[in-house]
């Protein structure tokens, strides 16, 4: 299902020439993204291009600054901000990534290209629920919840770069009653070939 219009509130599009030289960045945010039929108009001369997009990159992330005509696509990186403790215990803004390589603009007609986005953030929720308070009780604060992963530094192609071991811990712990509790934490993307 297309979650763009309901979950994405900011888009940054990076445009590169066919050789990967940075040309410019174009951004949009706000209610226009939530219409369900959003299109970003990009004015380009005839030629071949590469497009890369990060969506939802707000205060939780740092993206490298690029210089037009100088920087290359390999210079574009995103890093999750972190304290010296390497503990991430706040809710992250949902982050999305997409790219299109080898786009050929002929200039003969209006041309539409679709950038499919994949989500780079995960929310993990633990729900503890007993049948009643008399037969089963749990104190959600009596446990430690943590995901350790070095997945907070992303390359232009969304691959993971070498990173610190980050400690993802709960940003929300709620004891509903003696038999129910909720714990939420988040992390950046998981990969099947990596152990967390």
Regions found by a protein language model. Name each.
Residues 1, 116-131:
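A short, Gly/Thr-enriched small/hydrophobic beta-strand-prone motif that recurs across taxa
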Residues 2-6:
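Short consensus segments that form the blades of beta-propeller domains
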Residues 21-120:
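Short, low-hydrophobicity acidic/polar segments
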Residues 9-66, 136-196:
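Tryptophan-paired
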């Amino acid at each position: 299902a297309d979650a763009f219009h309901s979950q994405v509130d900011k888009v940054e599009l990076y445009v590169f020439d066919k050789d990967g030289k940075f040309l410019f960045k174009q951004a949009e945010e706000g209610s226009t993204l939530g219409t369900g039929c959003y299109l970003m108009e990009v004015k380009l001369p005839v030629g071949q291009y590469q497009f890369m997009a990060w969506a939802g990159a707000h205060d939780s992330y740092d993206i490298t600054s690029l210089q037009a005509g100088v920087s290359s696509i390999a210079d574009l990186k995103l890093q999750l901000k972190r304290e010296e403790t390497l503990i991430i215990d706040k809710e992250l803004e949902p982050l999305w990534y997409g790219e299109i390589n080898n786009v050929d603009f002929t200039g003969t007609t209006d041309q539409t290209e679709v950038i499919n986005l994949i989500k780079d953030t995960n929310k993990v929720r633990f729900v503890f629920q007993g049948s009643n308070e008399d037969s089963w009780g749990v104190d959600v604060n009596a446990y430690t919840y943590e995901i350790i992963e070095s997945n907070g530094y992303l390359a232009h192609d969304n691959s993971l770069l070498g990173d610190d071991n980050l400690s993802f811990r709960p940003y929300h712990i709620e004891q509903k009653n003696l038999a129910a509790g909720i714990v939420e934490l988040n992390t950046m993307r998981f990969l099947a070939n990596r152990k967390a």
